[in-house]
Amino acid sequence: MSELLLELFSEEIPAFMQKNAEEGYLNIFTKIFEENEIFAKVQVFVGPRRITLHATHLPKITLPKEEEIKGPSIEAPEAAINGFCKAHNVSKLELPTKLISNQLYYFFVKKTEEREIKEILPEIIIEAINKYSWAKSMFWGDYKIKWIRPLRNILCIFDGEILPMQFGHLTANNITYGHRLTDNKKLEVTDFEDYRNKLLENHVILERAKREAIIKTGLLELASSHELIIKEDNRLVEEVVGLSEFPVVLLGKIPQKFLELPKEVLISSMRTHQKYFCLFDKTGNFTPYFLFVSNGRFTNAELVIQGNEKVLSARLSDALYFCKQDIAKTLESRLGQLEAVTFHAKLGNLREKIERITDICNYIAPNNKDLITAARLCKSDLVSEMVGEFPDLQGIMGYYYAKHEGLNAEIAAAIRDHYKPQGLSDNLPSGNAALLALADKLDSLVGLMIAGETPTGSGDPYALRRQALGIIRIILENKLELNFNDLINFSINLYKDSSDENKNLIISFFEERAKFYFKNDYDIALINAVLDLNLVDTNFKLDALKEFLIEDAGKQLLNAYKRASNIIGDQKITGLVDASLFSTQPEKELFEVIQKISPQIIDSIADKDYKKALNLLSSLLTPITSFFDNVLVNDSDPKIAQNRLSLLQNICELFDKVAKFNRL
């Protein structure tokens, strides 16, 4: 069996694209080989500067084969038959026929001779290279090929020999290159084993999994040796794996003068901008140390550490300067600058958004001065120098600036937390922060849907689905008893171009998102039976009804309701129950129970005690069973029949006060 080695050597491939490229090329090569009846074991390795394919168990020759291609029937128009013949370069007389479902069809037998696999591999390889679609790609120079970054070399070896192949301006060879910084030299290779060994000798670790393991082990061991803690950060690990061909973990220190900066600034500078790992003491406090991954092992590691500390110091010096510049102005004084920041082309600027958020907050919690102050100032840090440099610190810098100005902790926390939650796993805000987050998200969602940015099956560029789930979580987990329908109306009316169509669209959107949220814990039929935009109330009902319907009594009662509903059918029952028309004991007893429990159920619903309401409904089970067993509803006397239908209607209406049982 034969072996194929291919390396695409390029300029630096973005780290976040490497894992997808590895999976993508593996799938593409595997599929193309199978389509050509080449059944090989395929591996793909991706690093910062190279994508490598290793295929083993390749046959030396492809087997001859015959493929039958079905053509038109013998009764088809002559033009169709001639077209089929022309496509396969044969005459009609050369085509065999086959009987299929009592109809004769022409067939063409395509014969493929055996070929040496090295003759067809170049074509297959080029097809596979071109088939992968990068999220972004580029042309360079005057060359015609397009790729993620400029390709510099192609290595292609089949069974120890260079496989003749041309890709764009590049001709395949048997050359690769060592580590760019420490061993940047040409390396001639003969096969995969030789290739991998020579790369390793020249400080390139081919396997992504090995580089990742080295980084994780190095981080833990170095942190532990200094009695420090590193928090798990798989996303950052994955990124630095894609930045290093020969990872070495080193420890650096933050100069004391920068420790006056908020820890979030330090963390953002290190993690987001420098790809460094923060370190904490055993009690969880931030420490003035960090770990970083050096791309290569250098003779003077101390020089590498000093270089990284110097780069970090330069960035933190800028941050310190920005911070001092920012605190020279109050959050209030920045409101005017928000007029120059567009929220959305159709929805005005951020100053106008602030006014709407403030109005919504005042509607939700009138006379809450801290909330109104937080609402007015919550976007002011967006025009600060710090947030301009570190966008991920929006809200956080507002929190620190509010504290610096002497605003109380409740206001500062609301400014900090009003962007939460930013995903299903994110923590929720509480107190005034929850109300401000609700107002901000609701205004954004309502405005953007009015502006025509409603999510579609193919996209949700403003993450409105996530915003809606955030609103739902805030309401439920803070148990905010809101008339959400009225709140949506109020928010819609803050926009000039609102309409009933907008209102219906937005309410329908929220209902769908609420169903999505609840369906993790409840059956969809249960949700449909109780859902309305009083979400806290809906949640109480779902809990009570789910528990109730698990019990045998609940199931029997639901069946009784359905039987009553089916008997009524589409009839419109309008008359009141007349007790004087009762002629049997079961209907008298059933009516007495209904009269007894009806006011109690109404009171229980008013108190949101749905478990009690359902337990009261359970007291109908015995009399309603007796009624169905012993009473004929459709009596020969029309008045008695109508009265009994009214009695069943009473039962259904009583059930429907708790939930829409007809949807269960």
UniProtKB/Swiss-Prot annotation:
A GO biological-process term: arginyl-tRNA aminoacylation
Origin: domain of life: Bacteria
Disulfide bonds: none
Catalytic activity, reaction form: tRNA(Gly) + glycine + ATP = glycyl-tRNA(Gly) + AMP + diphosphate
E.C. code: 6.1.1.14
Localisation: Cytoplasm
Keywords tagged on the record: Aminoacyl-tRNA synthetase, ATP-binding, Cytoplasm, Ligase, Nucleotide-binding, Protein biosynthesis
Nucleotide-binding keyword on record: yes
Name of the top EC class for this enzyme: ligase
HAMAP family: Gly_tRNA_synth_beta (MF_00255)
Quaternary structure and interacting proteins, as annotated: Tetramer of two alpha and two beta subunits.
UniProt similarity note: Belongs to the class-II aminoacyl-tRNA synthetase family.
Protein name per its UniProtKB record: Glycine--tRNA ligase beta subunit
Natural source organism: Rickettsia conorii (strain ATCC VR-613 / Malish 7)
Organism ancestry: Bacteria, Pseudomonadati, Pseudomonadota, Alphaproteobacteria, Rickettsiales
Gene name tied to this protein: glyS
